[in-house]
């Protein structure tokens, strides 16, 4: 992407204040051509449905070379889905360490009232600034930590699936996930105080489990009976 290319930055009214405004400023300061897409939902929750996805497609000009998603689950999944279909790369600016889907190869969306998770491409880059993450609501931080705790049973379930169903098991992915979990658990005490190192370790664990899922093209490294 060069400075003459168009970058579409996508955010809602909440993530704009947290990180979107600064992201746009930084891009413009560095000479990039930027277009902004704001989902002004008020106090309502943005849904990754046909209306949301269609709006992103509508705002994607023909000379758009990159999208930047500023948010967490819904914003990331929506931009991931659209760019995977249009062939554009995208970058996610994480605003909360709340889930493991930032770099996973699925994009949960709603279609005709039903939720499903079509395959989508991976993000070109993930920005996880702890100065941004520490502003996330505590319940989202707790959700992310709960997601990490669930990986313990996910790995155990994977072992069981190998024995019971002769499933494929990737030792590299298991090692990757376990190391990330150990680091996160060692620093978990600091999450209640929004300690930057603890938040960084949490996002790293969530990110690496997403990477593990993408590597084996199944959810076993990160999801099981939990």
For the regions a language model picked out, list residue spans one by one.
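Alpha-helix capping and helix-loop boundary segments enriched in small/acidic/polar residues
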Residues: 40-47, 114-115, 136, 220
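Solvent-exposed alpha-helices and their adjacent loops that cap or buttress functional pockets
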Residues: 59-62, 83, 116-121, 125, ...
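Active-site segments that bind and position negatively charged phosphate/pyrophosphate groups
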Residues: 172-226
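Alpha-helical scaffold segments in soluble metabolic enzymes
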Residues: 22, 55, 59, 81, ...
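Hydrophobic beta-strand segments of well-ordered beta-sheets in folded domains
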Residues: 5-9, 124-126
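N-terminal small/polar loop signature for handling phosphorylated ligands or for N-terminal nucleophile
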Residues: 8, 13-91, 190-201
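Short, small-residue-biased leader/transition segments that mark boundaries at the very start
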Residues: 1-3
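A glycine/threonine-rich phosphate-anchoring loop and its flanking beta-alpha core
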Residues: 81-183
């Amino acid at each position: 992407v060069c400075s003459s290319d168009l970058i579409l930055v996508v955010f809602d009214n909440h993530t704009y204040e947290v990180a979107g405004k600064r992201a746009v400023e930084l891009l413009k300061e560095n000479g990039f051509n930027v277009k902004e897409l704001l989902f002004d939902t008020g106090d309502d929750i943005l849904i990754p449905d046909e209306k949301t996805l269609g709006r992103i497609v509508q705002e994607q000009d023909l000379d758009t070379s990159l999208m930047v998603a500023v948010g967490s689950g819904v914003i990331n999944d929506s931009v991931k889905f659209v760019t995977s279909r249009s062939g554009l790369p995208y970058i996610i600016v994480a605003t909360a360490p709340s889930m493991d889907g930032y770099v996973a190869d699925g994009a949960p969306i709603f279609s005709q009232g039903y939720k499903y998770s079509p395959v989508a491409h991976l993000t070109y880059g993930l920005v996880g600034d702890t100065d941004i993450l520490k502003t996330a609501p505590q319940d989202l931080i707790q959700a992310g930590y709960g997601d990490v705790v669930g990986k313990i049973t996910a790995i155990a379930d994977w072992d069981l699936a190998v024995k019971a169903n002769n499933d494929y098991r990737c030792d590299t992915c298991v090692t990757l996930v376990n190391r990330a979990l150990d680091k996160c658990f060692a620093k978990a005490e600091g999450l209640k105080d929004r300690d930057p190192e603890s938040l960084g370790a949490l996002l790293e664990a969530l990110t690496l489990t997403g990477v593990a899922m993408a590597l084996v093209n199944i959810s076993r490294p990160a999801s099981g009976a939990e």
